[in-house]
Each structure stands twice: as C-alpha cells, then as structure tokens.
C-alpha cells in the first residue's frame, strides 16, 4: 500500500496491540520499530495510559522525543522539537483529573454507583491488578485529565452512570481491561487529527497515516486513519469501523505484538 520512503505517520495503541496484554512483551515488533526508526517514520503511541507511563515506555521502545497521545486523547505530549507550540510540553483537553474525581465521588456518594478508581487504592494493589512493577504502577496514578476505574455494578446501572456522565459533559470509555472517564471533548481521534495537522503544517504535505489498535476505545482513532490494522484482541466487543474496506483495513490473525508485526507486514508488502 505504501513505502517507508513516503511521508508517513504510524499511530499505535499499547496494551494488547504493541504490547502483549499479559507479559507486556514487545519483542515481536522490534524489527519493525527499528526499520521505521531508521526510515524516520514517527511511531506515535496512543493509549489510555498516563503521559508518565508512556514517556517511560517511549524510552524503552526507542521512540523518545516523538509526540504521544495519553489518557485516551485527553493529553497530548508534544514532540521535543515543538517547543514553540503553545502549551509545550503537554496539551490538556477538557477538565482536570481532580475535577473529574470530584464528580465521580459525588455520584458514588449520592447515587450509590459501585466502582473502584485507581485513586482509591495504592500502587501495590494496582501492581497486583496489572502485573506491573510497583514503580511502574505508581506511574499509572499520575492522571492529568481522566480517571481509570473498575466497574463493580450491573449493566443497567452502567447505562444510568454513562447517561449521568454525559449530562455532566463527561464520557465513559472501555479500555482493554479498565474503564476510563474523561471530558466529552477529548478523544484519540481529535488528538491524532491535531498531530497530523501539525506535521502537515511543518512539512507542507499531509502524511499518510496508519493506525493500529485492538479495543473499542481504539475505534475513533482508526476511523480517522488512511489505513488501519485491527489487532486480534481479548475484548469481547472487538473493534467495528464504519468503513472496513479491505484495501484500507486489515484484521490480524495474531494477537498483541505478533499481530502488530503482521499488520505492518501486510501493508508494506501489499503493493
């Protein structure tokens, strides 16, 4: 479909896509990450994780200095060379983590919804839930514009909770393992479009875009990509796009980083 020589941006989800859902291993994707880095193709990480978590992962993956999308699009970490852009080093969309937490605490106290947020527990508990080390688990609590939670109520109550959040200008989003509350104005798609427009403004040409994801919260991102890889995932709802033209969308047979590699193999060889 395209070559590594043309202007190209790769947007990638993390857990269940570039990273294995259980072990967080990414080695099957390492050859492609090296090839893209050598070809000066930016790989822009896009996740529900905090910017602190993602900056650590960026360095681990050899992607430091590039922009990234954190907290499902509520936070954009700017590229190191974008220091002249207003808001550097991060752009926050919507209300803050603290304000969202206040709303959730009020709903829990007054309307008796049952859930546990990451703010309710310590890093040892999060490490147990996620399989992360204590130091990495501590980074998951550094939210700036969203709240991560475990839902502990019925599906009927979830529908009521979602409606109440919508009334208050918030959205309730499902990730690979947890649920996330963020401002209704934020999203991976809006954040990706902003980054694409910034690259276009700086280079004078709109880059071709390829997105990879495995969960329902990746659908908005994949909808705005020129090409999309839907990595086989664990979520029972999966990913469904409005336009699933097979020349544009590839569903992998493999999961996690093996699927990530499969998707890159497909689009770079299908010329």
Curated annotation (Swiss-Prot):
Key words, A-Z:
Cytoplasm, Hydrolase, Magnesium, Metal-binding
Q: Name one GO cellular component term.
A: cytosol
Residues where Mg(2+) binds = 13, 15, 214
> What domain of life does the UniProt record list for this protein's source?
Bacteria
Query: Which coarse location class applies to the principal site listed for this UniProt protein?
Result: cytoplasm
The kind of enzyme this is, by top-level EC class, is hydrolase
**Substrates-to-products reaction catalysed:** 2-O-(alpha-D-mannosyl)-3-phosphoglycerate + H2O = (2R)-2-O-(alpha-D-mannosyl)-glycerate + phosphate
Give the protein's cofactors.
Answer: Mg(2+)
One Gene Ontology term from the biological process aspect of the record: mannosylglycerate biosynthetic process
Q: So where's the catalytic machinery, residue-wise?
A: 13 (nucleophile)
Q: Which GO terms describe its molecular function?
A: magnesium ion binding; mannosyl-3-phosphoglycerate phosphatase activity
Does the entry feature the keyword Glycoprotein, yes or no? no
Subcellular location(s): the record lists: Cytoplasm
Q: Give the Enzyme Commission number.
A: 3.1.3.70
Q: Which Pfam family is one of this chain's hits? A: Hydrolase_3
Give the family, as the similarity comment puts it: Belongs to the HAD-like hydrolase superfamily. MPGP family.
HAMAP family attached to this UniProt entry: MPGP_rel
Record protein name field: Mannosyl-3-phosphoglycerate phosphatase
The record lists the organism as Escherichia coli (strain SMS-3-5 / SECEC)
């Amino acid at each position: 479909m395209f070559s590594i020589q043309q202007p190209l941006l790769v947007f990638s989800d993390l857990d269940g896509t570039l990273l294995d859902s259980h072990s967080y291993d990414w080695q099957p994707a390492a050859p492609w990450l090296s090839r893209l880095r050598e070809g000066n193709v930016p790989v822009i990480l896009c996740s529900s994780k905090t910017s602190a978590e993602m900056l650590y992962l960026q360095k681990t993956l050899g992607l430091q200095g590039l922009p990234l999308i954190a907290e499902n699009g509520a936070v954009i970490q700017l590229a190191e060379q974008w220091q002249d852009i207003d808001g550097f080093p991060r752009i926050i969309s919507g209300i803050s983590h603290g304000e969202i937490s206040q709303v959730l605490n009020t709903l829990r106290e007054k309307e008796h919804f049952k859930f546990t947020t990451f703010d309710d527990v310590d890093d040892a508990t999060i490490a147990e839930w996620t399989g992360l080390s204590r130091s990495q688990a501590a980074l998951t609590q550094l939210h700036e514009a969203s709240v991560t939670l475990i839902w502990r109520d019925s599906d009927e109550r979830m529908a009521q909770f979602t409606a109440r959040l919508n009334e208050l200008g918030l959205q309730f989003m499902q990730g690979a393992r947890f649920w996330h509350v963020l401002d209704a104005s934020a999203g991976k798609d809006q954040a990706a479009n902003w980054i694409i427009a910034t690259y276009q403004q700086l280079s004078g040409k709109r880059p071709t875009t390829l997105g990879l994801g495995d969960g329902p919260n990746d659908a908005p991102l994949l909808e705005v990509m020129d090409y999309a890889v839907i990595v086989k995932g664990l979520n029972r709802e999966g990913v469904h796009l409005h336009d699933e033209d097979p020349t544009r969308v590839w569903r992998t047979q493999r999961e996690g980083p093996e699927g990530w590699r499969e998707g890159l193999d497909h689009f770079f060889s299908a010329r």
